[in-house]
Amino acid sequence: MAVPAVEFPWEEQPMSAFATPITPAPIPDNISLTELIDKYFTAYNSARLREICQLLSQRVFKPEVTVGLSLSGAMTPTGLGISALAPLVRAGFVDYIISTGANLYHDIHYALGMDLYAAHPFVDDVQLRKESKIRIYDIIFDYDVLLETDAFLRQVLRSETFQRRMGTAEFHYHLGHYVRELEVQRGQPHSCLLATAYECGVPIYTSSPGDSSIGMNVAAIALEGSKLIIDPAIDVNETAAIAYFAREAAGGKGKSAALIIGGGSPKNFLLQTQPQIHEVLGLEERGHDYFIQITDARPDTGGLSGAVPSEAVSWGKVDPQGLRDTVVCYTDSTIALPILTAYCLNRCQPRPLKRLYDRRGEMVERLQQLYLQAQLQHKVKELPTEAPVATYPCGTPIRRP
């Protein structure tokens, strides 16, 4: 079936050019998912989801675009790490990931063959506690799932591979290697997002590495004398380098995209790559070219989770010229994610894997050289022509009586 020509409503054109009449028609019994979305998702958040599907498939998932995905909320316990995210990674549509540690931790349950059960949320939690069962809204599993996953993690993290300082991308790469070996032993491929990212060279970062059961187990082995240290500065520089050098694709015409599932700290860590480049490192940068978010967070409470793309422009996180290529859909990510994955896998040809994990060191070295050059130029321009003025530590001049 031919892809229908799409008039994006965010294009700069008169209202009459994109105000398409709604022409209701019965949904046929043999309709495909892509046709359902293109023709029947006509308004409100169904229309925003349609716009996301079309923007991703027609513009974002192109070889010259570097796509960063942020992941928050309990997505992997639902199975979506395996069913919806891993296929996007294998198809080359996601180049790097920033996730909560909890999503990566619960993802490992499936690689270990642990059982999580679909239930309902209207249960007696006191009774569940007595029965040693854990609840994530309408998902229930045994407490032993946590204990066995913790034991696996501590066994792996005690290995020599982890006995040094590293960033979370390297940490998750090595962890993904062990999980992949476990998949092979169990004869169950594609059981874990971590293993898929390892195979595809997609770096996974965690913005708050201590804020999850993975971080808790890292802390536990530190009490045993482990030399493992997670260094967040490594992550900040690596992600900034990825965003900065995204421009080099397609002969200097490359673009950068932020695909945000939920919000929270991973969203900020993905978007802060741009202020890190221009505000802190002093390098020229215009912001991400594409901003796509699925969230249930309101923008009017001031939280980052609900902050809209236009607000991000004021921070230099999003290119003002790219505002027409931004969409926010207010819905449950567990509804939207399977839909957009199925749509894009149907509409898009797979992209070559960028394997950014393998290029991290080289990109950071180049970023460091550019930063040091910028610092040197900045110092030359600021050579004092007058006697220095004493200041407080914050920089405020000290007024003399």
From Swiss-Prot:
Keywords: Transferase
Organism (species): Thermosynechococcus vestitus (strain NIES-2133 / IAM M-273 / BP-1)
Entry-linked InterPro entries: Deoxyhypusine_synthase, Deoxyhypusine_synthase-like, Deoxyhypusine_synthase_sf, DHS-like_NAD/FAD-binding_dom
Gene3D superfamilies registered for this protein in UniProt: Deoxyhypusine synthase (3.40.910.10)
Protein name: Deoxyhypusine synthase-like protein
SUPFAM superfamilies: DHS-like NAD/FAD-binding domain
UniProt record similarity statement: Belongs to the deoxyhypusine synthase family.
Domain of life of the source: Bacteria
GO cellular component, one term: cytoplasm
EC nos: 2.5.-.-
Matches recorded under HAMAP family: DHS_like
A Pfam family per the record: DS
GO molecular function: deoxyhypusine synthase activity
